[in-house]
Amino acid sequence: MGDSGSRRCTLVSRLPIFRKSINRRHDSLPSSPSSSNTAGVHSSSPSSTNSSSGSTGKRRSIFRAPSISFHHKKGSEPKPEPTEQNLSISNGAQPSHSNMQKLSLEEHVKTRGRHSVGFSSSRSKKITRSLTEDFEREKEPSTNKNVFINCLSSGRSEGDDSGFTEEQSRRSIKQSTKKLLPKSFSSHYKFCKSVPQSQSTSLIQQPEFSLAIAQYQEQEAALGRPSPSCSVDVTERAGSSLQSPLLSADLTTAQTPSEFLALTEDSLSEADAFPKSGSTASHCDNFGHNDATSQPTSSLTAVSKTKMEFVGTAPCVMSPGRYRLEGRCSTELHSSPETPAGNRREVSLQSTELSVGNGSDPETHLPAHHQRGESPLAHAGEPALRTGSPRTLGSYDQHKALAERFKGVHPVSDSRVIPSSGDHVFNKTSYGYEASAAKVLASSLSPYREGRYIERRLRSSSEGTAGSSRMVLKPKDGHVEASSLRKHRTGSSSSKMNSLDVLNHLGSCELDEDDLMLDLEFLEEQNLQPPVCREDSCHSVMSCTAVLLSPVDPGKEVNMLEEPKCPEPSKQNLSLRITKDTDQEARCSHVSCMPNSPSADWPQQGVEENGGIDSLPFRLMLQECTAVKTLLLKMKRVLQESDVSPSSSTTSLPISPLTEEPLPFKDITRDECSMLRLQLKDRDELISQLQAELEKVQHLQKAFASRVDKSTQTELLGCDGLSLKRLEAVQGGRETTHRNRTMSQSHSTRDRKAIHTPTEDRFRYSTADQTSPYKNICQLPGLCLSNFLKDKELGGVMKHTRGNHEAVTSEMTQNSRTTMGQSFLKAAAKPEGLPMFSEKPKDPAALSRQHSTFTGRFGQPPRGPISLHTYSRKNVFLHHNLHTTEFQTLGQQDG
């Protein structure tokens, strides 16, 4: 139940909300979870945790929630009982207690997570409420200020962290905690909170530490799975490993009380002065702050994780050790604000290396810490911790404590160490990366830099989360996840730190699309600048280690409980050696500020200690994967370069040529279509021009016709008839008009008609010629040119006809009275025979109409539209008197 409870709570805590709140709640909650969890065991650790987390919680008014969660933990869980109870409970009651703790922790995290950073929650988990309250009271003013400052500093990034961390934790929680999440989130959340405590308690119960470790490993596996929620995961997983050590009298509690006291004190100074890495809580805060500052979101989440681990374990374990480490490690880690992140990394690395380097130490160290933890539970923790710690106190004790924190949670069961190794590798990697990242953090401390890396980290952390969810069942996965999250969160620096190392891990473990993409960015950098890929490689390494080690973890966890360090050290050595080589390489360059950092030296020791039997195959696998990745990336680049068009670039090589080939054809077709369209437009314009010209010519012809018939009124009628009939049928109307015109002319003066009929015939034929081209133009636009030429010819003909008309008009005016046109009239009437005779009956009416309508318009050619002349009083009256006699004569003749 403890495992499931812790996993559930981890899963729930992994939820972005819970993650955020858990990180902060763990910050504010430390005393609360600790007091409920470690009635006695955590009480020593709680003092410092409470001081930092309690002050944070109280300052943030979230501490009430921790107290509630403490009530949950205390009331619902037996864990609130002293550490001894926790020790006894750790195996049996721990599950429920851890579940309760997780519940309360999650509640605390919920209430408090947003405000407090993960370090507080891990502390709170590891500190008994009474101790927490005591330390709160003792150090609340300063510690709370420091913690609050740290929380605030980390809180700045927490806001960001909450976003990315939540997303990452959400992904990881969703992936890793889907199975457990179905259970009530609140319950899991509470269990998550209590489980870390119970895990700490079980770790506190280090006699049962193997079993507790198994449980904790399971819980941590659950926690580790949720570890994407960095605060809760790391807090819980680190809470298992960190909190558990802190809570557990074994590792952290013994150290935690004094360390937390020191942490609280140091945290006051450290929180105020980050360079003081002495207080892990402050370190965690600082880390949170630095990471949060440098990597507001991812860094903070990683910081929360790291903080949780460091706060949980590092504060306790590292407090004395870290005080000393602080002297050294804080110089190294706290060499710069980023150093806290680096410190985190280093602490993680140190703890990783401690756990790895002290693969066997964790057990001995755990018992020592366990003994120390129990004595620290009596607040002999600091003295005991420092007593036990002093030997390791420098970096070693911290590493031991960290190893215990990591391995302390899984120290006896180095199955845990495998997760721990995975975690340590990743912690070391993440912390080693973060150690480098710490340096990078100095520059990385800028939120901008983190923002850039945060995106990658988010992607990577989501990958890492996915990887962790893949590794969900492995506590190491949780640690790996947390480490990867830390790496990614600590972020840019971590990616810069050991990106090559991580890439190697990445390559061997999993080739994720994101990893490939990230490696695309960092592949060359990876070779040239390994840190750049650190993030991706961290995620990949996390995933890889989780994939490679996680399959072994479930069984190995139990087996490792029995055979705690045998398989794990090798795997730890695998990952640690790989990470160590890369980390040390990166550290040599990046951790130069922390050259003395045990993590830099210890990973190698741990790796060498645990032996690198598996490291070679693992490394070979990583190299092979990396080579494959490189080839794939090269292929991708070649494809991208070879592809001319973006669409072809997305397609595979065989497709791209095909895609390229059709493109020319399409272009050709498009060109042809455009050319054709242009031609059509030109032709249409030509047609319109020709039509306009034809209309003009027709108007001219009308004018000519009226001009030709100016001496006769019949021509005007003919023009009107033409205009009316032309609407109906151009040719037919024109011909009919000519016929009517001819008939009226014949009825008028035969001489005039004799002269005019040939003209009409000629004009009519020319008009027919014009009309036929017009039809052709309308029907066959393709013949525009030929039609245009024809129109030109017609224009010439029209001009010629115009001249003829003028000549005919002059002739008609001269010979208007001649009688020689009678024979011509007959000749003209013969071809038109039927129309003439058929229309003759209508002529009288037409003539009368003409007479009435066109009176006074005789003899003057119309200037402009016929209608104007028809209705022009001027024309009518001017010409009326002049032509009255002539008109009467014509009428008589027609009659």
Curated annotation (Swiss-Prot):
Highest taxon of source: Eukaryota
Keyword terms, alphabetized: Coiled coil
Coiled-coil regions listed: 675-705
Skewed-composition ranges (Low complexity): 43-56
Region (Disordered): 1-142, 154-177, 332-394, 459-497, 731-753
Compositionally biased intervals (Basic and acidic residues): 131-142
Polar residues biased stretches: 83-102, 348-358
Protein family per UniProt: Belongs to the CCSER family.
Protein name: Serine-rich coiled-coil domain-containing protein 1
Gene from which the chain derives: Ccser1
